[in-house]
């Protein structure tokens, strides 16, 4: 007999049957339970892998959409800049046209005013000449005491007008 009691026959048979029972239990578990657990684990692993693949696919699609939206936003900004530039250019052209039209209208008004002034001046000069001629004729008739012929009359009128024009021209330059 073994003093430790490990190799005693009654203990050895108990250990033997415990090992046999354990092996039978393992065989039964391996045969009936393990395949079910393994299948469930594989199914779960496949579901997780599929979920990861779908998440990555969704993430990739989201990135593509984000890039597409960014491109669209940038294109819209570029288009908006073009529209603003075109509007500014058109506004500037419109202002230039309005300035040019105003300048032309001002020039026309000034030209009409100058023409009107010239007509009025010419009319005033004709009136003054006529009145001066009448006064010269009356004055010369009184001084001379007789009627003048047409040539003498014309000469006196021209002298008076030249004298008057010289005075007017002298007054303008002063």
Swiss-Prot record:
<dbReference type="Pfam" id="PF00430">
    <property type="entry name" value="ATP-synt_B"/>
</dbReference>
<keyword id="KW-0472">Membrane</keyword>
<dbReference type="InterPro" id="IPR005864">
    <property type="entry name" value="ATP_synth_F0_bsu_bac"/>
</dbReference>
<comment type="similarity">
    <text>Belongs to the ATPase B chain family.</text>
</comment>
<keyword id="KW-1133">Transmembrane helix</keyword>
<keyword id="KW-0812">Transmembrane</keyword>
<keyword id="KW-0138">CF(0)</keyword>
<dbReference type="InterPro" id="IPR002146">
    <property type="entry name" value="ATP_synth_b/b'su_bac/chlpt"/>
</dbReference>
<dbReference type="GO" id="GO:0046961">
    <property type="term" value="F:proton-transporting ATPase activity, rotational mechanism"/>
</dbReference>
<keyword id="KW-0813">Transport</keyword>
<keyword id="KW-1003">Cell membrane</keyword>
<feature type="transmembrane region" description="Helical">
    <location>
        <begin position="9"/>
        <end position="29"/>
    </location>
</feature>
<dbReference type="GO" id="GO:0046933">
    <property type="term" value="F:proton-transporting ATP synthase activity, rotational mechanism"/>
</dbReference>
<comment type="function">
    <text>F(1)F(0) ATP synthase produces ATP from ADP in the presence of a proton or sodium gradient. F-type ATPases consist of two structural domains, F(1) containing the extramembraneous catalytic core and F(0) containing the membrane proton channel, linked together by a central stalk and a peripheral stalk. During catalysis, ATP synthesis in the catalytic domain of F(1) is coupled via a rotary mechanism of the central stalk subunits to proton translocation.</text>
</comment>
<keyword id="KW-0406">Ion transport</keyword>
<dbReference type="GO" id="GO:0045259">
    <property type="term" value="C:proton-transporting ATP synthase complex"/>
</dbReference>
<dbReference type="InterPro" id="IPR028987">
    <property type="entry name" value="ATP_synth_B-like_membr_sf"/>
</dbReference>
<comment type="function">
    <text>Component of the F(0) channel, it forms part of the peripheral stalk, linking F(1) to F(0).</text>
</comment>
<protein>
    <recommendedName>
        <fullName>ATP synthase subunit b</fullName>
    </recommendedName>
</protein>
<dbReference type="GO" id="GO:0005886">
    <property type="term" value="C:plasma membrane"/>
</dbReference>
<dbReference type="InterPro" id="IPR050059">
    <property type="entry name" value="ATP_synthase_B_chain"/>
</dbReference>
<keyword id="KW-0066">ATP synthesis</keyword>
<keyword id="KW-0375">Hydrogen ion transport</keyword>
<comment type="subunit">
    <text>F-type ATPases have 2 components, F(1) - the catalytic core - and F(0) - the membrane proton channel. F(1) has five subunits: alpha(3), beta(3), gamma(1), delta(1), epsilon(1). F(0) has three main subunits: a(1), b(2) and c(10-14). The alpha and beta chains form an alternating ring which encloses part of the gamma chain. F(1) is attached to F(0) by a central stalk formed by the gamma and epsilon chains, while a peripheral stalk is formed by the delta and b chains.</text>
</comment>
């Amino acid at each position: 007999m073994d003093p430790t009691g490990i190799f005693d026959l009654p203990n050895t048979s108990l250990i033997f049957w415990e090992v046999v029972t354990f092996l039978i239990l393992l065989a039964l578990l391996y045969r009936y339970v393990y395949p079910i657990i393994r299948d469930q684990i594989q199914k779960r692993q496949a579901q997780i892998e599929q979920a990861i693949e779908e998440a990555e696919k969704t993430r990739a699609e989201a990135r593509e959409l984000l890039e597409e939206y960014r491109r669209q936003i940038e294109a819209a900004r570029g288009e908006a800049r073009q529209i603003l530039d075109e509007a500014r250019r058109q506004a500037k052209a419109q202002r230039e046209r309005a300035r040019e039209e105003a300048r032309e209208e001002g020039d026309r008004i000034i030209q009409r005013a100058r023409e009107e002034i010239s007509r009025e001046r010419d009319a005033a000069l004709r009136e003054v000449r006529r009145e001066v001629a009448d006064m010269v004729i009356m004055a010369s008739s009184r001084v001379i005491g007789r009627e003048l012929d047409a040539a003498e009359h014309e000469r006196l009128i021209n002298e008076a007008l030249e004298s008057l024009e010289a005075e007017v021209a002298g007054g303008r330059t002063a």
